[in-house]
Amino acid sequence: MSKPRTRVAVIFGGRSNEHSVSCVSAGSVLRNLDPERYEVVPIGITTEGSWVLGSTDPETLSIRGRALPSVDADGSALALTADPTRSGDLVALDDGEAGKILASVDVVFPVLHGAYGEDGTIQGLLELAGVPYVGPGVLASAAGMDKEFTKKLLAAEGLPIGFQVVLRPGTATLTDEQKSRLHLPVFVKPARGGSSIGITRVAEWAALDDAIAHARLHDPKVIVESGIIGREVECGVLEFPDGDVRASVIAEIRMPEGAGDDEAFYDFDSKYLDDVCEFDVPAKLDESVSDEIRELAVRAFSALDCQGLARVDFFVTEDGPVINEINTMPGFTSISMYPRMWGAVGVDYGTLVSTLVDTALARGIGLR
């Protein structure tokens, strides 16, 4: 008798400004979950926050030209019950079916990027519901989403970070003293965002206030970081079902000559639409530098109390590696660096997502 398949809910979309990136990531996950091992239940979250039963066809979640996918409200409306005695039950909400159990899932893969998904919110719901899930828990997800607290935790562990100033709601701009501690260029960012959305490179102070206003379109709390001169690299961290935590090879992102001017950086269009960046996987670094980055990545993973996976971004400077940020649910598109880094060491995409699901099931539920 064949072993029953594990029922995996893949959740995507969401209310954040990274809605479309989440959809594309989920399409790649759907494409690579082994149908002999897993029965997939796709759940889309609209930009308004409604949960609907999605399509199992990954092509519906693909980028077409420069058109990005999104979740519409046409599917059957549903909700995940937060009652742990009904762990994993997905309940219909539509008239005539309200209360009917549409499916009961064994584990959730929350392929959500940004606010209301990657920031500890859905992780809290899944903890209440008593459902195992892929990725870090509530604390690590919340801290990893907020660049202020990411760096506070990293600094507390003695890990190398750059200088930043936090502008909370009600604080309009930098003081002269803060400007003197920063050095141009600076990067102005939403404190709780990803995919390089809302980020501006500021080369002169006259442009600062416009950059802050732009970032505040996405988050009332803003980070201003000193620009760091160095090579931009990334390292993936993966937890296995036995609890072993490993780091991937290092990848380097390069803006090729002719792709832009001195102000070019790895922004949203560069990542997902324009195909102008060049990547070295593995990066062409001295072995000792690569080993140091891998060690720092695992230490950063531990500093935030992550589980499952994370991608740690660095600058390699003349004085050594500096951690830029941690992404607790990195992109899973076909061109995303996290699966590419693991693919370079023989962990193909299908094996990667299976490992993540198996690790979530091994971890179980409750305090740990």
UniProtKB/Swiss-Prot annotation:
Per UniProt, the keywords (alphabetical) are:
ATP-binding, Cell shape, Cell wall biogenesis/degradation, Cytoplasm, Ligase, Magnesium, Manganese, Metal-binding, Nucleotide-binding, Peptidoglycan synthesis
**Matches recorded under Pfam families:** Dala_Dala_lig_C, Dala_Dala_lig_N
List locations, semicolon-separated. Cytoplasm
> So where does Mg(2+) 1 get bound?
D313, E325
* Domain named ATP-grasp: residues: 151-358
Question: How is the cofactor bound here?
Answer: Binds 2 magnesium or manganese ions per subunit.
Can you tell which superkingdom this protein's organism belongs to? Bacteria
Reactions catalysed, semicolon-separated, are:
2 D-alanine + ATP = D-alanyl-D-alanine + ADP + phosphate + H(+)
Per UniProt, what is one GO molecular function of this protein? D-alanine-D-alanine ligase activity
Pathway assignment reads: Cell wall biogenesis; peptidoglycan biosynthesis
Q: Does the keyword Magnesium apply?
A: yes
EC number from the UniProt entry: 6.3.2.4
List the GO cellular component terms.
Answer: cytosol
User: Matching HAMAP family, A to Z?
Assistant: Dala_Dala_lig
The role this protein plays is: Cell wall formation.
Q: Which family does it belong to?
A: Belongs to the D-alanine--D-alanine ligase family.
Report the protein name in the record: D-alanine--D-alanine ligase
Q: Which organism is it from?
A: Rhodococcus jostii (strain RHA1)
Annotated gene: ddl
